Amino acid sequence: MNRREIKITAKEAAKQAGKAAKLVTLVFLLIQLGLNGLQLLTNFLTSRTSGGGSISDALAADTRNKAIVYIIMVIVGIVGVLLNIGYTRIALQVHRREPVPMESLLEGFQIPGRAIGLRLLRALLMLMWTYAILIPAIILLSIPITPLDRMTESDTWFVIYLVVLLIVAVAVSTAVSYRYWGATFILLDHPDYTVRECIRAATEMTRGHRMELFLLDLSLLPWNLLCILTAGILYIWKMPYIAAVYAGAYEELDRQYQQKKERARELRQQFPTRQYPPEQM
């Protein structure tokens, strides 16, 4: 994956998209800001609400307030997921030099079941992988550690082992996050795919390219930091470019993945009795 070429293409595509992409980005950011503000306002108002004089009334009011907060959080989360699906469509349109209509932001609301299902399944899988690594580290952390002035050689090796295990846990968690990279793009490009098929395709597509995706994120980190320093205002101009970079990376990985599948089909036709593994979906 040629990061430099992908970025050059994304820069040209974002420039061609022009004001339309910036306007859609502005609306997207304002809606996200409004959703976050709604959640903060709800937390503030419910925290100031008194349940009355008695303890039972206070407990009832506290329970009611927590329920309201949780409901608002769920609604905000769902709307945020669906809007992100819509902006992913915008990213593909910018990269492909297609028109960028405002209606594309609402595309997630046309497939709410698949969009939310994909987010939940991906979160569940990442959580399972993370806990599989973190649980041994948590167990080891619960073991009392001897003070430094009384440490034996075995205690020192135990601490070193613990630090290494924690580093490995962080590394594995990061790698797992790239395992399902691109699943949202696949969801939009393949409306006939189920949520599980999108996850499987993303896993196969990113195999052998996860370090490249990590380096791509690192290369875009300066732009993200600069946008944050401007209170997010710079995102209006740079978010279409950043999104187009990711869309370009997806299309490059997808192209290589489709070529791999095609080669596997050809080999199966030539050697029908031979077991050939590349297409594992």
Spans of model-derived segments:
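Hydrophobic alpha-helical membrane segments
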Residues: 1-281
